[in-house]
Design a protein with these regions (language model features):
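Short, solvent-exposed segments of well-ordered alpha helices
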Residues: 1-12, 66-73, 104-111
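Amphipathic alpha-helical interface elements
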Residues: 1-45, 130-134, 138-141, 145
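Flexible secondary-structure boundary motifs
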Residues: 20-100, 111-124
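Polyanionic, low-complexity intrinsically disordered segments
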Residues: 71, 87-160
Length: 160
């Protein structure tokens, strides 16, 4: 149970990083360059809205934006299961580490999955500002520099 809770917390924290980056990038950009908000009734997924904002803010090309969209789709899927769980139980699934049948969410929130999602968040904490400094709009450069400087100790710890 401690691994389940810790994994869930790490995954939600990773999603919160992307939410904070979304909000910070909206603060930096002029209104004409902002991605549309969800309030337009489009029903767009949160991961797609965040992807579009980060694409515009950090100057991502379509291929890199596609990679980010794929990662964010998974991050938000895991986050949504933790924050907005279904009240119904589905069929039991085999836990990848314990080898026993468990409720689906118990199999989702493992150390391995948390590690992958945290590493993805840290990778994008480095990738996005690095690209932003080189090819992003000038309004994002201060935020990009701050992210690279503030997170440098984390990069060193996770890249070894």
């Amino acid at each position: 149970q401690p691994v389940f809770k810790s994994s869930m917390q790490a995954i939600v924290a990773s999603a919160t990083f992307f939410e904070a980056l979304y909000a910070a990038s909206r603060e930096c950009m002029p209104p004409a360059r902002l991605a549309p908000r969800a309030s337009n009734g489009s029903g767009a997924k949160r991961s797609a809205l965040v992807t579009e904002q980060l694409k515009r803010a950090f100057g991502l090309k379509n291929a890199k934006a596609g990679d980010l969209a794929s990662v964010l789709s998974e991050v938000y899927r895991f986050r949504d299961e933790a924050v907005h769980p279904s009240s119904s139980f589905g069929p039991a699934v085999l836990h990848p580490e314990l080898g026993v049948l468990v409720e689906r969410r118990l199999a989702m929130y493992t150390y391995a999955n948390a590690r992958l999602i945290v590493r993805a968040a840290l990778a994008y904490c480095k990738i996005l500002p690095t690209l932003g400094e080189k090819q992003g709009p000038k309004e994002i450069r201060d935020l990009a520099h701050f992210l690279l400087t503030a997170a440098a100790p984390l990069f060193a710890a996770w890249e070894t």
